[in-house]
Amino acid sequence: TSAGVEWATNNNHNRAKALSDLTGANLAPTVGLFTLVSQVDKHAIILGVDPINTAGTARTGQIDPMLIAFSDQDNIVEWEPKSTNTAGALSLSEGSTIVGAVKSRQEILVWTDTSLYSMQFIGPPFTFGINLINKETGLIGPNAAIVTSKGVFWMAVDNFYVYTGTVQKVPCTVLSYVFDDINVSEVY
């Protein structure tokens, strides 16, 4: 998988260009699982990203499935965390891989295979805060969550859930029909 891209328009041809190939790119991720933009505070965010090496000179090229990296505010080419910018990274602890994320009202909800996290912009010096919302309610696949006016709904490996500030199981008359015939070894 590739990391984030920018769409370049040239002679009526649209093409994607890797962030790491952009002029001035500094430690931009080279691989990642998911990319999104936190539009209110204007940060590019890549989930399941390759970390910066121990020397701090390059990306490793190997996905850390529990690492989230974010660019400097309103600057998609600057990914090196410095005291003079808002770039940085967060590591999740519950689960083995990030499965998906959605932008909600005041937060970005991030699911691992086992848990749900809330990621919120808090400003410098930490930029984003991450809070574990619930264990044992992971996401079954990258497209198994949706934001609605009634809350955020998703499918886990054992149930349907809704988040409205707290996590609740969704009453469902077809629950056994769906989950009694699912091969959990083939989930994301």
Per-segment meaning from a language model:
Residues 5-19, 75-84, 124-130, 168-171:
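Beta-strand initiation motifs
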Residues 9, 29-30, 71, 171-175:
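Alpha-helix initiation/capping motif
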Residues 32-80:
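Carboxylate/His-rich catalytic cores and anion/metal-binding grooves
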